[in-house]
């Protein structure tokens, strides 16, 4: 393990309660961790001037220099709020979206503490996807470059043996997806986190949405209770509240309000509030309403994207899928057919929301709401481009109320509900039900061709190996 250069002036360690005789409670327990009263960070009477430098936040010179070398000119809002509190030794709940600078908000305090008391397996960051895990690890290594910090990434899809060798080198920071971390805790000889000092759960709402809850419970049970914990999430759902109660001690909450996103005046936006079980039914109704127009249907997962493509084809719609698990040639083929209008419906994950050369379309349907407001804006930005008009309709079910309110908050306005005719919708029920059954068979055939990896999609569940795949 490389030597960490200790800081010249040691900061006095904060007083902490002794919890060494008890394990962390399960996040499934509603009455877990009784001493977890959440404290809101109260705004001051007069507005404070935003810190202009990282030094003003209490960071040492080496880390300030690292921020400068990384191109961080001034602290973002979440960094300005979270870093001083973290340096005081408090557990934190950070409500902030992707792109807010939250990675540095938790990485910098951990690195500063690491310089005081260098040790292996000092910090653990849990992330929902492989791509995010690598991004976080790169941030730690970049910010810790002047103090020789080493991190390792544990994610699915990679060789367990090479990861075990990396763990044997005793890195300071581990960035992992929950499934693969638990695999190593259970199977890698000599690997333990009993001396862990810092735990971060990044994008906690997505961790729970992706069914990592039971795995998180198992991980929390083997971590030392005497640690600092940071939980970052875009939303504060009931599941996240439960996870907070199980894992944090007297946390402070810091929230950064989203800026109001602007949309063009030629875009007609609305939402449709329906029971989750009727999503397919209302999708067919809307496609009939906009027949002949080009449409992108956005889904949250690869499985749902592929299933909807089969389902719509069975009903006679010219639908084609686009997602990250297609080969490059298949993705280019799908885009080519959509551009040429030989297929007028593109069913896609968020790979189609940004970065791809997709022409403007007539209609965007958010079949699944995205995890953050910025992605929502990118999605609906696929229509009403270059002065043209466009329509964007978002599906909201009983499970999406908080997410939808957050999106409306980011937009800065309430959107109208789309006036669906329920009687006309229900007329389609028999045909839709038949197509759903046939689509299940189509998915089974598709999975058999894909092999054992695909069979996991057929059941709608993923093993630990696949749970952390980027949804796009």
Curated annotation (Swiss-Prot):
Q: Which residues form the Helicase C-terminal domain?
A: 282-426
The UniProt regions of compositional bias labelled Basic residues, in chain numbering, are: 452-462
| Gene Ontology CC entries for this record | cytosol; nucleus
Compartment(s) of residence: Nucleus
- UniProt cross-references to SMART domains, sorted A to Z: DEXDc, HELICc
- Which residue stretches belong to region Disordered? 1-52, 443-472
Per the UniProt record, which EC number(s) apply here?
3.6.4.13
> One biological-process term from Gene Ontology?
rRNA processing
Q: Where is this motif: DEAD box?
A: 202-205
Q: Which GO terms describe its molecular function?
A: ATP binding; ATP hydrolysis activity; RNA binding; RNA helicase activity
- Please give the catalytic activity noted in the UniProt record: ATP + H2O = ADP + phosphate + H(+)
Q: Which Pfam families match?
A: DEAD, Helicase_C
Entry binding sites for ATP = 96-103
Residue ranges under compositional bias (Basic and acidic residues)? 10-24
Please tell me whether the keyword RNA-binding is annotated for this protein.
Answer: yes
Q: Which InterPro entries match?
A: DDX47/Rrp3_DEADc, DEAD/DEAH_box_helicase_dom, DEAD_box_RNA_helicase, Helicase_ATP-bd, Helicase_C-like, P-loop_NTPase, RNA-helicase_DEAD-box_CS, RNA_helicase_DEAD_Q_motif
- Motif Q motif: which residue numbers? 52-80
User: Which keywords does this Swiss-Prot/TrEMBL entry list?
Assistant: ATP-binding, Helicase, Hydrolase, Nucleotide-binding, Nucleus, Ribosome biogenesis, RNA-binding, rRNA processing
The residues covered by the Helicase ATP-binding domain are 83-254
The family classification in the record reads:
Belongs to the DEAD box helicase family. DDX47/RRP3 subfamily.
> What is the UniProt domain comment for this protein?
The Q motif is unique to and characteristic of the DEAD box family of RNA helicases and controls ATP binding and hydrolysis.
Subunit structure of this chain's protein:
Interacts with the SSU processome.
The task this protein performs is described as:
ATP-dependent rRNA helicase required for pre-ribosomal RNA processing. Involved in the maturation of the 35S-pre-rRNA and to its cleavage to mature 18S rRNA.
According to UniProt, the name of this protein is ATP-dependent rRNA helicase rrp3
């Amino acid at each position: 393990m490389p030597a960490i250069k200790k800081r010249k002036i040691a900061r006095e360690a904060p007083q902490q309660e002794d919890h060494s005789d008890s394990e962390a409670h399960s996040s499934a327990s509603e009455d877990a961790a009784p001493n977890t009263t959440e404290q809101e960070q109260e705004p001051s009477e007069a507005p404070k001037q935003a810190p202009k430098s990282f030094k003003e936040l209490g960071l040492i010179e080496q880390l300030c220099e690292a921020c400068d070398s990384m191109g961080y000119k001034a602290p973002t809002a979440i960094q300005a709020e979270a870093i001083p509190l973290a340096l005081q030794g408090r557990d934190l709940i950070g409500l902030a979206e992707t792109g807010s600078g939250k990675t540095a908000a938790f990485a910098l305090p951990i690195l500063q503490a690491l310089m005081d008391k260098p040790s292996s397996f000092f910090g653990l960051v849990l992330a929902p996807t492989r791509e995010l895990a690598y991004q976080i690890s790169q941030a730690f290594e970049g910010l810790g470059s002047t103090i020789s910090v080493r991190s390792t990434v544990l994610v699915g899809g990679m060789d367990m043996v090479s990861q075990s060798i990396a763990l044997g080198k005793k890195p300071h920071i581990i960035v992992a997806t929950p499934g693969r971390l638990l695999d190593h805790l259970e199977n890698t000889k000599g690997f333990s986190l009993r001396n862990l000092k810092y735990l971060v759960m990044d994008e906690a709402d997505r961790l729970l949405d992706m069914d990592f809850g039971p795995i998180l419970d198992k991980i929390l049970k083997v971590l030392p209770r005497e640690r600092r914990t940071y939980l970052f999430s875009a939303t504060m759902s009931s599941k996240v509240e439960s996870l907070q109660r199980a894992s944090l001690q007297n946390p402070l909450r810091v929230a950064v309000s989203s800026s109001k996103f602007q949309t063009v005046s030629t875009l007609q936006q609305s939402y449709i509030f329906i029971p989750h079980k009727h999503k397919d039914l209302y999708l067919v109704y809307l496609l009939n309403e906009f027949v002949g127009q080009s449409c992108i249907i956005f889904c949250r997962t690869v499985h749902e994207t592929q299933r909807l493509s089969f389902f719509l084809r069975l009903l006679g719609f010219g639908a084609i899928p686009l997602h990250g698990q297609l080969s490059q040639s298949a993705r280019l083929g799908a885009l080519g057919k959509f551009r040429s209008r030989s297929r007028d419906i593109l069913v896609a994950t968020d790979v189609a929301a940004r970065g791809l050369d997709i022409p403007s379309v007539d209609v965007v349907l958010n079949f699944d709401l995205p995890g953050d407001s910025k992605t929502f804006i990118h999605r609906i930005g696929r229509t009403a481009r270059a002065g043209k008009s466009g329509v964007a309709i978002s599906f909201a079910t009983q499970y999406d109320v908080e997410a939808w309110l957050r999106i409306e908050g980011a937009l800065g306005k309430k959107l109208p509900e789309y006036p669906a005719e329920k009687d006309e919708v229900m007329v389609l029920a028999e045909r839709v039900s038949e197509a759903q059954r046939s689509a299940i068979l189509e998915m089974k055939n598709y999975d058999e061709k894909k092999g054992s990896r695909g069979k996991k999609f057929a059941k709608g569940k993923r093993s630990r190996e696949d749970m952390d795949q980027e949804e796009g």
